């Protein structure tokens, strides 16, 4: 009978409950349908896609700032490494710790701008962009 249905009818994807959620003692008394419903709600509120978009936007921003000469290639690579390290650590632990920025970005640094003759008004905007709030998972 189900074979007689037209092929253009969309199918509802099966929602699989992850083992981590299924083994939770609070979910033990729920039946399979209730767990699937709860997990579908969990997927709606999942912040991972937003987190990935933020990371992508941050990497593009680093490249653009390097292109404009606000930061050097070494600084951009250092920031990308901090982001990668922070992401790996955040995914490995339940409560991520604060990330310490590389020495390159200390306020005491009095170096030359990336392009000769090009002065940046303030490095405070760069520091605010690199604050640990944007690097650690909220």
Swiss-Prot record:
InterPro entries: FAM216 (IPR029373). It comes from the Eukaryota. Belongs to the FAM216 family. This is Protein FAM216B.
